[in-house]
């Protein structure tokens, strides 16, 4: 089974559990690292999540995944916060973090670069609008590989 199929099935299955706990389902990843498979579920809420949030949701998700068995091989389940460099995937993510520093990578170089760090100005049908060193840059949606919050030091 393709990784994307696993992610889609798990996302669909766990979303009601996360919503019932009044939390946001930020992302689901299914990755192989060092010979082991990991199913990572990232959750959040205003003000940030606590260990109890992760534990409560993890237990319910674990039980559900045992029942529906959407993953073809053994894996480790991890439920956690998305962290300070959280991914931005949905339009609502970009709206929520408008004005924040973001790090965006593209599939192919745009003006000679595939990595862009700048202030998020807007997200619309045109693309993702950033301010980088005082200049506005628009990255078309179809060119964006990943988008994350960036840490200002």
Swiss-Prot record:
Q: Which UniProt keywords apply?
A: Cytoplasm, Ribosome biogenesis
- SUPFAM superfamilies attached to this UniProt entry: YhbC-like, C-terminal domain (SSF74942), YhbC-like, N-terminal domain (SSF75420)
Instruction: Please provide one cellular component term from the Gene Ontology annotations of this protein.
Output: cytosol
So which residues are the signal peptide here? none
Gene Ontology BP terms: ribosomal small subunit assembly; translation
Record's keyword annotation contains Transmembrane: no
Q: What does this protein do?
A: Required for maturation of 30S ribosomal subunits.
Name of the protein described by the UniProt record:
Ribosome maturation factor RimP
The scientific name of the source species is Desulforamulus reducens (strain ATCC BAA-1160 / DSM 100696 / MI-1) (Desulfotomaculum reducens)
């Amino acid at each position: 089974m393709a990784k994307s199929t696993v992610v889609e099935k798990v996302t669909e299955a766990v979303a009601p559990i996360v919503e019932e706990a009044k939390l946001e389902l930020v992302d689901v990843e299914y990755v192989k690292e060092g010979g082991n498979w990991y199913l990572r579920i990232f959750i959040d809420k205003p003000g940030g999540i606590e260990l109890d949030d992760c534990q409560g949701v993890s237990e319910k998700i674990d039980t559900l995944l045992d029942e529906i068995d959407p993953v073809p091989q053994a894996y480790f389940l991890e439920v956690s916060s998305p962290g300070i460099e959280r991914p931005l995937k949905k339009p609502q993510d970009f709206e929520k973090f408008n004005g924040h520093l973001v790090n965006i990578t593209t599939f192919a170089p745009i003006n000679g670069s595939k990595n862009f760090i700048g202030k998020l100005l807007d997200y619309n049908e045109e693309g993702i609008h950033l301010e980088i060193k005082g200049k506005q840059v628009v990255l078309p949606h179809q060119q964006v590989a990943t988008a994350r919050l960036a840490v200002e030091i």
